[in-house]
Structure formats: C-alpha cells, structure tokens
Amino acid sequence: MPADRKTAIVTGAASGIGRAMAMGLVGAGFDVVAVDRNAALLATMLAEADGKPGTVTPFQADLSDPASFDRIVAEALGKSGRIDVLVNNAGIGQASVRDTYGNNPIRFWEVTPELWARFLAVNATAPIMMARAVVPHMIKAGRGRVITVTTSLGTMVREGYLLYGSSKAAAESAMAVLAADLVGTGVTSNVLVPGGVTDTPLVGTNRGNRDKMLKPEIMVPPLLFLVSEAAQGINASRFIAADWDTTLPAPQAAEKAQVPIAWLGIARMPIEPG
C-alpha cells in the first residue's frame, strides 16, 4: 500500500448511503475499512471495488457492542498506520420498529426503555465512541476529518419521530461539541445529510414513490469535497446534499449547501457567574 494513500473508516457501509459513500471514497483512491453488521453484503463490495483506485477492507461489527470501536480502529491502523477520515453513517431507522411508520406514527408513549436504549446506542453513542477511538490518532498526525450523517432538522422534531429524530439530534449536538473541542488540532467535525427521504433500506414501505426519492449517490460529491484539501479549514458545519449543485465548482457548490451545525445558528450561551 503506497505510503501516501489515505485511509477512511465508513460505518454502515454495506448498503444505502454508506455503500455509496464508501465506494465514492474508493473511487477517489482511498483505502476504506467498510464496517457493517451484514457480512454477506460487505463481501459483495470487494468485487465492486475491483479495478478502482482505492481498496475495500470489509469488517463485520455490531456498533452496539462497546468492544467494537477499538477493534475497528486497530484494523484500520494495521492496514496503513493512519486514519484520515471517519464517516459515521451507521444507523437504525423507524422501519425497524414499524414498517408502516409513515402513516402510522410511533408515538412516544409506545417507546419502551429497550427501544430507546437501542436507538441511542447505534445512532448517538456509536458515532461519539467511534470518534473517541479515532480522533487521538488524528490529533497525533495533525490532520483528520470526522463526518457524521445525521438527519434533517425537521425530522428531529417531527411527530412520531422520537426514536430516530431525537437520537440523530443527540449525535449532531455531540458533533458540534467535537468541533469546538478540536479547534486548533488540524482535525475537523462536520455533519452531512441527504436533505430528504432517500431510497435506502431504512425507509419503510409507505414513505412514497421510491422513484421520486433522493438516491444514496447524492452524498458522494459533498463527501469528496469534505475530505479534500479545499475543505481543510471547514469545521462545525452541516452540508445538505440535496442543495449541492454539481454544475458548479466544488467550493461554490459547498457554499450553497453549507449551514452551521445544529444549533450554532440559534444557540445562546448561558450567563456565567463572574
């Protein structure tokens, strides 16, 4: 493996948005550690990556298991001795509870402690703990990108979306704190969202016409910008893939798709004594 090749970890990489982003990075020459629970789908990524500039290393892991984070990092470091990019994408959606959630909302009083714990573990705790495991190596190298897939702000406060919306809101809040903690380290923390209902396995059967949904590949252009040298100084931002204009040069497209990470646009710091 060439010494100047960059390494990325992508969680939830075997299907949907995660697969599109992982293969986009492979196409850009990254060596990608593709993390997912589904070993069979992970294995199919090897053939898809064949002949591309980068490589795929499938890594089966359950991110609800606290032991998985250090194992993933060890795998990535064992391949190249470096980790340049962490893409926190793994998540569970409302359809895992009720496939018809689109017209039969999951009310908050239906949410059991077990369901709440499961959604928090995967959608909020996992990205935080993955960053905790990866970032010290990035800081030591003086460079690194943490990119986390959350969801549209409207989804975070939507009727019937306590499980998914609130857990993704927790993840975004955490990434804003990471961004503040990382100032001056050479490592950045940003959020990337599709900007609408996307045609992935997370979506239930009654969420509308799949032909009219956003496609997972919409995430690739903003992701490739965020991992490029042109995005070196960008921190504490959220990028909305649906607003990315592929007819523009990447820096101009980024300006159109970029807003502050939640909730910096409305945040007011509390009054401190003294």
Language model regions located:
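A short, exposed helix-loop element centered on a Lys and neighboring polar residues
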Residues: 131-132, 176
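Conserved glycine-rich Rossmann-like NAD(P)H-binding loop of the short-chain dehydrogenase/reductase
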Residues: 28-44
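Canonical Rossmann dinucleotide-binding motif of NAD(H)/NADP(H)-dependent dehydrogenases/reductases
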Residues: 2-33
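The beta1-alpha1 cofactor-binding region of Rossmann-like NAD(H)/NADP(H)-dependent oxidoreductases
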Residues: 39-40, 60-72, 113
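C-terminal helical subdomain
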Residues: 184, 191-192, 208-274
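Conserved mid-core segment of classical short-chain dehydrogenase/reductases
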Residues: 70, 93-117, 140, 160-163
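Catalytic loop of short-chain dehydrogenase/reductase
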Residues: 107-115, 145-170, 175-176, 180-184, ...
